Amino acid sequence: METIKRMIWPKKEIFVGDFATGVNRTVPVNIFQLVCRVVLRYMRTGKIECDSDSMTKFIVELLKTDCAAKWEWFMKRRQRGDYIVPLSIASIPIIPLLSYATRVRAVSVKAFGNELSFNVRVPRPSVPKKGLLLRLAAGLALAPICALAVYATLPREKLSVFKLRTEARAHMEDEREATDCLVVEPARELKGKDGEDLLTGSRLTKVIASTGRPRRRPYAAKIAQVARAKVGYLKNSPENRLIYQRVMIEIMDKDCVRYVDRDVILPLAIGCCFVYPDGVEESAALWGSQESLGVKXGGLVRLPGVVTQINRDIPSDVLLPQEVLEVRTGPPNAKDRNIFMVAGCPSQARFLVHNHCLKNLKRGLVERVFCVERNGKLARTPQPTKGAFGRLSPFRKAVCEKVGVAHRLGYDGFLSYYSGAKLRTYTRAVESLHITPVSERDSHLTTFVKAEKISTSKGDPAPRVIQPRNPRYNVELGRYLRHMESKLMKAVDGVFGETTCIKGYTADEVGAIFRAKWDRFDKPVAIGLDASRFDQHCSVEALQYEHSFYRAMYPGNKLLGKLLEWQLHNKGKGYVPDGTITYRKEGCRMSGDINTSLGNYLLMCAMVHGYMRHLGINEFSLANCGDDCVLIVERRNLKQIQRTLPEYFLNLGYTMKVEQPVFQLEEVEFCQAHPVQFQGGWKMVRNVRTAMSKDVHCVNNIRDLATRRAWSNAQHHGGLALSAGIPVVETFYSRFKLYDVPRKHQRIDTVTNVHKWRGSGGSYVVTPESRASFWAAFGLTGDEQLALEDRLERWEMDLFGEEGVDAHEPSILDSAVA
């Protein structure tokens, strides 16, 4: 038995650095898979299908399909000799009920004038008078066995073929067309010279559909109708032909049309897409407005800051004995913030900014630091189970072995990493540290409301707060960690065996990384991991696990241990014009800490690595950007991950949501950007709706002309560097005017809105392939892209005129939420 188990379920080795974990772990027998294999061997589907969550549902669904296939054969395709064997088996239970007596019968035959006579014994069945009950019992015992045998021998076509015909009906007008159009026959497995599988197209199918020459044109017309129903009527242009081609390839993949037929069907179907009914070609509304709608000049609009209308207190059972939140109300003399917007951009989304006032600060601390909302009520963040982070120690050991022992930076070495305003701040902190050493008071938090763009579509969200510590504390801790950040990232990449920590790369490099990750898999699926308020869920145990990485690099360092211990017991104050707030909090990541980014990378990578190790899945790829992650796996592992991941992370104290899986590379969303193919390869492109709505808003005070010029220059240069060769977005950023950069301007670094990825720039043109890829990523067809670009070309900015009012005109983007 053990030998059979080893043959069917081989042991899987999981390596963490140079250490193998889980080698001797016995893989339990999966009864569900075993029953599936046995049943499917009879059903002859040719593959293991595991779409149901329970064995009962799986078997019932399979039996329904089998019964439907046999019934369809009986009603539509039966022939005379099909049911001889089932009827013969059905008569077997009657045999024991009969008694056979013989009688002699004389038979005479005349041949060549002679008559020959001989006796023949003829059996005569009859119902016996004795032993009837015994014979009846024997017949009843045989009845269920024979019934199963009759069902098993009933004729039907192969189930995979039956399913193919059933799915084809979705693309046909009636059942006869689906049956006549698709004649299914076994496919050939293509092998290379070394015996490897050769993939021609998107996938290699075991069963393919052969469309004979007379049937190719009707099938091409049908899939053209389906493609037009999905995408709409488009102009006959190269980019739109590519869009139709992608949709029709997906349809033929689903119908399992063989590749030799696709070569003939695809051009016919693409041509059919541009054959319009009478009157359609004259309808200009189908192509989008190419005429000027009287676009107004893009003047500045000033929008005042907002104050939250929700006031909630912390429940008494949430705070620990050592935790406190004290609110002191002052005179109502709060100042309003302003957010500036350039009017006339074709985007409906609008953004506001939270004022720095007591009401906003209190709600931000209550809902983003102390409490989470659960079932409509405020509650404490979930806490990890005992020993949960101890199971992640193999990952830490592997990373620390690659990093080794580190040495602390000097003050000058730490300052060399900074420039501008931060350099001046840290220089003053270093001068102070030469006089007075760091103390526990330097770890106290100063809290304020973040000036963040808030979408009006989100209602009244809780304001975000920033909680920096004293620069003196940041200098001392930064001397240990600032120069080790990149080394730790590379060590994590080494443990995963590929680029995992996406930091410090250009948008082009990140796009190439995702292309390489996607190509690693035969049938890839990408799953977004959405950590709800990741910083808030960092418990004391999670922070201690993160700190163990740093302690391992500096073994026995008492000052580092003291600095890290102060992060576990936080004391802070928030000063606003209309009051103050004093609080104490155990655990929780403070957004102003110098190790916030590095710590989030380490925690997320460790938890995902431990989770995949827990499942025993070796084939996976992770892209991590702090609390934003994308996990790429084989499609066969999808349901297992969707079912088990939230519970695993909840045991670690994190609320993790598994987003909807995507099966196309362009559909992957990572840091609000999608991979898009362009002339130079692949590039991560920000969501067009987000970019065109957020980037016309500025939360900084740009009332003076010099700051406006600096902001416009930054948007132009930075935007084009990130979007060269990309439809729509490149045109959008080119509309920001270029001005002479002022020689001396102290606030230029605060208005540039630098994105987390650097742009590589370059001179590229928009190709039909990039428009098709852009459509796959954001759902804008080639015609819609051209209409938006035409609209943007007529959009003129006027940053130096009088402040106006918001003027919005309808556009293609209005139907989507930014």
Swiss-Prot record:
It catalyses: RNA(n) + a ribonucleoside 5'-triphosphate = RNA(n+1) + diphosphate. GO terms for biological process: viral RNA genome replication. GO terms for molecular function: nucleotide binding; RNA binding; RNA-directed RNA polymerase activity. SUPFAM superfamilies: DNA/RNA polymerases. InterPro entries: DNA/RNA_pol_sf (IPR043502), Rev_trsase/Diguanyl_cyclase (IPR043128), RNA-dir_pol_PSvirus (IPR007094), RNA_pol_HCV (IPR002166), Tombusvirus_p33 (IPR013707). It is an enzyme of class 2 (transferase). Its EC number is 2.7.7.48. Keywords: Nucleotide-binding, Nucleotidyltransferase, RNA suppression of termination, RNA-directed RNA polymerase, Transferase, Viral RNA replication. It holds the Pfam family RdRP_3. Residues 524-641 form the RdRp catalytic domain. RNA-dependent RNA polymerase that plays an essential role in the virus replication. Belongs to the tombusviridae RNA polymerase family. Readthrough of the terminator UAG occurs at position 297. This is RNA-directed RNA polymerase. It comes from Tomato bushy stunt virus (strain Cherry) (TBSV).
